[in-house]
Amino acid sequence: MKYPVGIQTFDQIIERGFVYVDKTDMVYSLATEGKIYFLSRPRRFGKSLLLSTLRAYFEGKKELFAGLKIDALEQDWHAHRVFHFDFNGINFTESGALNRVLDSMLSEWEREYGIVTDVPQEYGLRFYRILQAAAEQTGRGAVVLVDEYDKPLLDVLEREPELLDRNRDILKAFYSVFKQADASLRFVFLTGVTKFSQVSVFSGFNQPKDISMFDKYEALCGITEEELYTQFAEPIREMAESDGCSEEEIRLRLKRHYDGYHFSEGMTDIYNPFSVLNALDSRRIRDYWFTSGTPSYLIRLMNHFHEGIDELTNKYYLPDEFINYKADVEYPLPMIYQSGYLTIKDYDKDSNLFLLDFPNNEVKSGFLAMVATNYLQCRMPLESWMVKAVFALKRGQLEEFRKMLTSFLAGIPYSMRRKDNEPERERYFHYTFYLLLRLMSVYTVLVEKEQSEGRVDCIVETPQYVYIFEFKLDGTAADALRQIEEKGYARPYESDARQLYKVGVNFSSKTGTVEGWKCRR
């Protein structure tokens, strides 16, 4: 089986015999049931391939679709003029870059249709005349496809406020052509990571239909579990043989590491296509999607966010709280969700609330490592420390874990842990410990878990051990351990067969590390 790793052109995939997960029935629905659409999906999730498929369809390339679902649906196969804007791979951080890109594309099309302008005109008006000319020449409405419509904004987000405003104004004027040129248009499809509420393409009449959370199109990009098990049964079997395990074990590993995305209340399981194809191609389960690059705009945004990531994850939200992004508001939830680092995990119909959390282990470990590295700025390599810490907890070696934690915290610069008041200092140590433990994603880590007798600071559950931690800042480890006993935090685990450890920890705000540690079995 040939995997289209790094190939996003529908023509190449079909002509060169690469495996293709057939989404063409949904392509037909889009083409016949609407006119102007917007779809938000994370990077490397198949948006470019979708637009390439739409282009081939609207250009009437019937031979490419032989044997696919759409072959039995479409009868006419009319050819339309397709205008494809692909902003992928273009650097918009320089002033004037967006102007040059648009001018280059429009100039080429103006030459094609013999359009001559004596005076400089706005981009929207120039494109309007091009669309008119195309429709008149072909006798059919033109098709416009825009890949990563928001990249000129994301490239300068939290970096160049003035350039962000200029690029936004240019795009507002340019995308407004879809309203003016309605009679010359057959179909418009825009993709992007996020939905900027200030861009006029999402306001007024003829606005795009946002299908990002439509049940019907939830699986438009990505791979469903059914598609994985039916179309990739052979490579899963080969992977199991290579690893010396069962096919069920491979399916479970793939699910834990790459599944978990849900884009609507329909809750269809969607696997990350980039990671799945890479894993099956190499027969190795690795962090392919995350290591392919973390968006710089997200890192910059998180630098301005003063709450912990634990304040955002595993919580219920109204749709408006995570769908529309406003660039002038320092609230990263919509960007984190739409970038693919959080996803829908549950939906309560009565209250219209959505539970958001990490989709899978690849995203959770990668995102938390990024946040921890950025937040702590520790001199010790985080990945190396994490692997050894996991090994210690797995074997019940609490003393070794204590030494490692003490050493790690001592390596954090004083400037990072300097806080003005006691609640902030205590919050810093709690959050630091939370990040480190959540990184050990093979375990269940519950931070500040509510119980009938109070709130437990931290519980770590492994297959063989349960660790109950209580923290104090500038207090004593004995007081922390006494609180575990007096509050009965271990009571829910009385019938648990695993070995239980109660650990009282005292942090010193002066040294920035562990000062006291008491453990009881």
Locate each region found by the language model:
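Phosphate-binding site recognition
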Residues: 1-425, 440-441
